UniProtKB/Swiss-Prot annotation:
Gene3D superfamilies the UniProt entry points to: 3.30.70.330
GO cellular component, one term: ribonucleoprotein complex
Protein name: Large ribosomal subunit protein uL23c
Keywords tagged on the record: Chloroplast, Plastid, Ribonucleoprotein, Ribosomal protein, RNA-binding, rRNA-binding
Quaternary structure annotation from Swiss-Prot or TrEMBL: Part of the 50S ribosomal subunit.
InterPro entries: Nucleotide-bd_a/b_plait_sf, Ribosomal_uL23-like, Ribosomal_uL23/eL15/eS24_sf
Transmembrane annotation, as ranges: none
GO biological process: translation
Origin species: Chaetosphaeridium globosum (Charophycean green alga)
Keyword rRNA processing: no
HAMAP family noted in UniProt: Ribosomal_uL23_B
Family statement: Belongs to the universal ribosomal protein uL23 family.
Ribosomal protein in keyword set: yes
SUPFAM superfamilies referenced in this protein's UniProt entry, alphabetically: Ribosomal proteins S24e, L23 and L15e
Amino acid sequence: MIDKVKSPLLTEKSIRLLQKNQYTFQVNSDVNKTEFKKWIEIFFKVKVMSINSCRPPRKKKRIGLISGYTVRYKKIIVTLKSGDSIPLFSI
């Protein structure tokens, strides 16, 4: 399962969500919520309250005459029980 998690997302919005005890990850498109919830609870030893996921739209990119699209990915936002935290995001 760890190979399906690409990276933690650190954007302005995700840093703002850290105050609400919500953590954002970029994952492969084939990961579902239940698998990810079990993995987070086992790996980080925390209690997951809810999980939200979305697939942001691709953006059109152009380099010279060649045009294409950015790679599509899946973003998962995990809400933890108050008092729990993931040390990976410690700032």
